Amino acid sequence: MRLASAFVVLAVATTHAAAAPPADIDAIRAAKRVDAVRITTPIVVDGVLDDEAWALAEPTSDFYQQQPAEFELATRRTEVRFLYDDEMLYVGAMLYEPEPERLITNELKRDFGGSSGDGFGLILDTFHDRRNAYGFITNPGGAQRDSLGYENGRRNDANWHGVWTVRTSVRGDGWSLEYAIPFKTLRFPDSAAQEWGLNMVRWARRANETSTWSPVPRQFSHYNVAYAGMLSGIAQAQPGRNLQLKPFVTGGVDRGSPNTPDRDADGGLDLKWGITSSLALDATWRTDFSQVEADEQQINLTRFSLFFPEKREFFLESPAAFQIGLLEDSNETARRELLPFFSRRIGLSARGQPIPVVGGLRLTGRAGRQTIGLMTMRTEDVEERPGDTFVATRVARELTSTVSASGFYFGRESSGTDPFNRVIGSELRLRPARTLEVEAFAMHSSTANQAGGWAGRTGVRLDGARHRMRAGYVHVDDAFRHDLGFVRRRGIGTLFSRYTRAIRPTGPSRVKEYTIGGQYEATANDRWDRSLTRVGGLTFGTFFNNTAEVRAWANSTYENLDESFPVGPVLAVPAGVYRYEDAGVAFDSNKSAALSGGFELSGGEFWTGRQRTATANMRLRFSANVAASATLARSVVDLPEGSFTADLIGLRLDWSFSPRMFLNSFVQYNGELDTWLSNVRYNLIHRPLSDIYVVWNETRSPTLTRRALLLKYTHLLAF
């Protein structure tokens, strides 16, 4: 407890010690304004800036480094122009590069990794609320990545896909690009003249340089539009009805599944309707997720359930509408203990097996100062189990520019023997400074034939240039139950804290920053009369400008087990009090290199014995079109009761025939289960947001062999 308090006091006391940007940076940012020029004839989007209309627009330039030399002028010049007509916003950019033949293009697939190679990104804050934004990113190969940034870049929805076009061209003095973004792809105020927040980001990978048009401090994302400039000059723009219908048909052969017919064909419909310029309705009928990639296997040496991330597109869209708390976008302790909304509870069994979804509705967006999220989904009956109806609702209101509050409800209703589970709660967020946020939320559960319970969290988050801190408290009653959340264990209270000090070299250096930090957490029962877990540790890191990094850590753990738990195939750790130490080191190489990889080694005491874990990964980029990667992991556990070894193997091949046609293969082996899993996906984008998928899934284990070949065709109709 004393150590946790010391971390909090130290971090808060040093908040004001963080270096402020130079005084002239605010003046530069205030002057960052560019006008879009109206044209009457659409341009030809081919990546070559040879249309006469481009001469009508005044170019804007002068990008400022975010990395490595914060706020210095970028070493590569970038010029950007803006045009528009009745239907489209056009963006043309010339990115000068002294050796364009050495540009780095790592991938061509949709939603490529944006910062691991050369690239350009356009950030639009269309409501000019200085909090939320659209992002449109490309690379010299013309790949597309689009996303939504929320809460000043702290949350990012890379699964949002809009209709837009980009083409690029590499030339002797650099590379150029042209965007065409339909106004109906965007949401913006219904007013005669538009003024949007604007920023642009460029990655010049060989120079290890990230720069933005309007200067952004290096500790923040380029989606932090509190630091954006202004795009003006757009008049009489209309977002249109923004009605999208996407019918789909599926078919396939499934051999070896006890609950699925050998051959099956089906169809369904997805709908998206922009009710207002800021509020959208999504509907889905006969929802299908057959094209979703398989979960990555994990080694579990703990007594808790594993956490698998959501991969289904429908649930990944508009995540900020249902996210509660400041830590939901990270791997913090508080997130592992209590996640207020976990969409994998819908349409998936406890073992990750699909449960058919009849359909659902989702309403998300803004109405005045309110942010609204409403979703309802219905699953089918499975054998003797009736289907469930799930409801998720959250309404947030900005009380002031720095204070917001929300109320939320999550529920499951069924006609079976377990008829309902309902959770209601509220949340408060404060942002007293750009780098400091405070949260608090509480919720109460009601379950049929069971007593109700409480759960909640308070926390503080500091993201300074030199000082970073997380601290707070999590409480979960023993009687609390949440069928739409992730609760690692009940009947606990956890204090957690983490402080990191970043040290940045002065003058030229290959190192971006060094970090040293400490963390402490203490968990007791919910009455705080019995200590359950205490973990304290130190962390060290060296982060290089070329994206390579070295990390090391050491932890000391106290555990008070009131009952035994299984570990490995046949062993068990008996009840009792345990104290043990462990440590580890990890390295990741330059991610933009043709050959990259890394490793992690950890080990030490483990309950009554010892354990050691080694993980290695390697990625080989043959070209912008083809890349292969491999991951190997082995954990060896030695206990007085016996020993065991757990192995994981992952092999991946990504082949992008073009920015609109891809082949992905993912093969995994889980040694603990003696199971091979294969997933091969072919994806052709035959028109914007319209896909053809061919998917092969295979599972082989001593008790099960299952093979499935699936076909899915989607066709977007936009009005």
Model-identified regions with their sequence ranges:
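Large, well-folded core regions of big proteins
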Residues: 355-361, 367-368, 374-376, 395, ...
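Exposed, low-structure sequence patches enriched in small/polar residues
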Residues: 356, 441-719
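Short loop/turn motifs that connect adjacent beta-strands in outer-membrane beta-barrel proteins
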Residues: 187-194, 235-242, 278, 369, ...
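Extended, hydrophobic alpha-helical segments in both membrane/secreted and soluble proteins
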Residues: 247, 265-271, 279, 285, ...
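Structural preference for beta-rich elements and adjacent junctions enriched in aromatics
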Residues: 17-398, 406
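Alpha-helix capping and helix-loop boundary segments enriched in small/acidic/polar residues
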Residues: 257-259, 270, 302, 351, ...
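Outer-membrane beta-barrel transmembrane domain signature of Gram-negative proteins
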Residues: 215-240, 379-431, 549-602, 613, ...
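Bacterial N-terminal signal peptides
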Residues: 4-15
